[in-house]
Each structure stands twice: as C-alpha cells, then as structure tokens.
C-alpha cells in the first residue's frame, strides 16, 4: 500500500486524531456485538504504547434531528473501551467546545479520549455527512497535525471526520485495520492467486451490478446465489413463482449472462416455500423452475454440489452476500454449504466482504475459518467494484 501508515510516524507527546468505526449495535444501552471495537484496538494500543495521546472520533447510527440522538451516545462504547484497554477512556460527551478542548489539553502521554458521536453534528445542516469545511478544520485543530484513519466502514464516504480532517493536517495516515482491509480485498481482486472464484449473494441485482461487471473481468468464475438468482432466471424465461424479482433489471441480468463467457454460474435448484414467513410447506425444486404459489428462499442441494465443484482447487475466494434467508434454519443450508466448501480448499485465501455474509459466518460459527472478514459492507462493495474510496484517497502518500 503506497499510503503512509501509523508506523511511519513519531507519536511521542503528540495529540493524535483517530477516526475509528465504533458503529456498534446497542440494545437498551448495551452493546450486543463489540467486534468493531476489538478491531480498532491494535491501532489505539500502538498509539498509546508509543507515547501518543489518542483522540478518537466515530459515528453511531443515523442522526438527522434532535430526537434521533436518543440512545445514540458513545458513552457505552467509552465504558467498553476502557475495560478492553485497562485504562480509563476520557469521555467529555460533546463534539466541540471549551469542555472538549480542555479535556484534550489535559491529556497526558498514553491517554485516550473519545469524542461524542460525530453525527450529532448532522442535526443542524448535516455538517458531518456533508463534510462541512469549518467542522473538518475545527476537529483537525484539536490535534498536533497527525490524523490516523482506521475506519474502513466509512472509507467510501467523504465526511468531515475523515476527509475533512485529512485536508487540514500535515500527515493523514492509515491505521492497521484500514491497512489490512485494503491489502486483503484490493490485492485479492487486483493480484489474486488463481483460480480466483467470486461468490455473490443477497437479494438485489441492482446492489451488485458494478461488482458483477468488475469481477467478471477479474475472476475465473462468479457464482450467483440469494434472491438475485430469480432476476437472472426470469431474464432467461425460467418460471420463478412468487420469488423476488427486479423487473427493471431483467435486461441488465440478460446482458451480464451474455457477456460472461460462461464465467457466471447460477444455481440449478432452490429450496422453495409457500410463503416467506408463515409457510406450511418447504421443499426442494426439481430443477431451476420455482413452483406456482411458491418462492425460492435458498439454493437447493444440487446447487450446493455444483458450487462445491466450482470451488474445487480455488486459491482466492471473495464472498459477498448469503445464499438464502440464513437467519431462518430452514433456509441456511446453502450458506453453510458454500462456507464449508470455501474453507476446506487447501491453501485458499478466503475473504468475506462484510455485511450479511460476515453476520452469517459469525452466527453460524465459521468466522474463525476465514482468512479475513471485512468490517465494512458498503466500503468493501465499492472496492470489489474497483472504485476509489474517498477516505483512502485523502491519505498522505509514502
């Protein structure tokens, strides 16, 4: 990676501004999944162990008006982070002003401070989300000219707390998490060890058009599963019953199939049910066609076998999107089958592109078997699409 990283800087005695991604799920003020906090620890620890004073910025949820602030404070995160670091994290509970400035100026080497939810600044004119120049300049002024971006989950956004701060400091560098994310995902797509197989699931073709187009050029095979299967089926005139379909994307699906030169591999059967939720019948289809009055909710056993065969000998696998409604035990066999087929390939570099696939791997107990699980759904999608990420472009070149 040609960008500077946190290891390239002398941090001793410096107030170091750090963008992390602490956008964690909360229920009644309790964190239900702390993976993102844990993922930021190596960078935070490196800064404080090298005598820096870490000033952390993160968003939490969406905040558009005053009422949205309810339950969106980073206070529970500060408490959790204090426990993980074994040292008190200073939390003034504000995003600007004298109280914040005094707390920052009182920091000693090796201390950590967490600024309140950056999106609280969105209440009056979307200053954070629209990268308000004054806000970026103000936040940058709180440090000593060093900014570390370790929030891959927001790297595809140009916000005041990443791009805005970057523009107003001497050195904007990558943290360890951001560095690893880029290394794994970008290198997998740009310089893969072959055979390189991409697996794309999820419900909508519209979300993945750019990704499919880019991966058809880069990968040896692209396997399609999930709800978007049925848009590809209908584009070929295959009966899909009541399955999910994007009527306005049929032409694009047909075009992708035609120009794929056989690289695009679709399921050959489905697990169908007579309703999405209150179903009374679940069965495997004979072939591709879904029965009248039924809808496809997972790939079927023949498809799992076909995908296992397609993955045979793969050296690089990138997976984004589940094969079915994996949250329901009746429709998780496809996702489990594909996961198991990926991780059993000898010497495979296996990467999950965040979002629902990451949740599936974690919930179904396979997370530790993958080489890398991305922390950013939207950002990893844009990397897979071959796009430049604003948060990354804003960093200082080596």
Swiss-Prot record:
Top-level taxon: Bacteria
InterPro entries hit by this protein: Phosphoglycerate_kinase (IPR001576), Phosphoglycerate_kinase_CS (IPR015911), Phosphoglycerate_kinase_N (IPR015824), Phosphoglycerate_kinase_sf (IPR036043)
Keyword Kinase: yes
The protein's Enzyme Commission number: 2.7.2.3
Gene Ontology CC entries for this record: cytosol
The keyword Isomerase is annotated on this UniProt entry: no
Chemical reaction(s) catalysed: (2R)-3-phosphoglycerate + ATP = (2R)-3-phospho-glyceroyl phosphate + ADP
EC class name: transferase
GO molecular function: ADP binding; ATP binding; phosphoglycerate kinase activity
Pathway the protein takes part in: Carbohydrate degradation; glycolysis; pyruvate from D-glyceraldehyde 3-phosphate: step 2/5
Record HAMAP family: Phosphoglyc_kinase
Family recorded in the similarity comment: Belongs to the phosphoglycerate kinase family.
Name the UniProt record assigns to this protein: Phosphoglycerate kinase
Species classification: Bacteria, Bacillati, Bacillota, Bacilli, Lactobacillales
């Amino acid at each position: 990676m040609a960008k500077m990283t946190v290891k390239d800087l002398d941090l001793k005695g410096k107030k170091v501004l750090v963008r992390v991604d602490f956008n964690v799920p909360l229920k009644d003020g309790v964190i239900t999944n702390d993976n993102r906090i844990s993922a930021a620890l190596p960078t935070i620890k490196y800064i404080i162990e090298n005598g820096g004073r870490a000033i952390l910025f993160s968003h939490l949820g969406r905040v558009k008006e005053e009422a949205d602030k309810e339950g969106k404070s980073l206070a529970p995160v500060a408490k959790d982070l204090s426990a993980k670091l074994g040292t008190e994290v200073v939390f003034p509970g504000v995003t600007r002003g004298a109280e914040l400035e005094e707390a920052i100026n009182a920091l000693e080497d090796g201390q950590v401070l967490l600024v309140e939810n950056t999106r609280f600044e969105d209440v009056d004119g979307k200053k954070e989300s629209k990268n308000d120049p004054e806000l970026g300049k103000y936040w940058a002024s709180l440090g000593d000219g060093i900014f570390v971006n370790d929030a891959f989950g927001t790297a595809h956004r140009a916000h005041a707390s990443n791009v805005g701060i970057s523009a107003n400091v001497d050195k904007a560098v990558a943290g360890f998490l951001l560095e690893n994310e880029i290394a794994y995902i970008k290198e997998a797509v740009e310089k893969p060890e072959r055979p390189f197989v991409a697996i794309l699931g999820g419900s909508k073709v519209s979300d993945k058009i750019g990704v499919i187009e880019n991966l058809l050029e880069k990968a040896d095979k692209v396997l399609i599963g999930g709800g978007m299967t049925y848009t590809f089926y209908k584009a070929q005139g295959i009966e899909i019953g009541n399955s999910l379909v994007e009527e306005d994307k049929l032409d694009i699906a047909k075009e992708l199939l035609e120009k794929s030169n056989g690289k695009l591999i679709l399921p050959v059967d489905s697990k169908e049910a007579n309703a999405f939720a209150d179903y009374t019948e679940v069965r495997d289809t004979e072939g591709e066609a879904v029965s009248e009055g039924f809808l496809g909710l997972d790939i079927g056993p023949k498809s799992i076998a076909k995908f296992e065969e397609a993955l045979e000998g793969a050296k690089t696998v990138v997976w984004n999107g589940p094969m079915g409604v994996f949250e329901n035990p009746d429709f998780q066999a496809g996702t489990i089958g594909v996961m198991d087929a990926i991780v059993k390939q000898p010497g495979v570099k296996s990467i999950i592109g965040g979002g629902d696939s990451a949740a599936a791997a974690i919930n179904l107990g396979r997370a530790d078997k993958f080489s890398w699980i991305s922390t950013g759904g939207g950002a990893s999608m844009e990397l897979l699409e071959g796009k430049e990420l604003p948060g990354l472009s804003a960093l200082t070149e080596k």
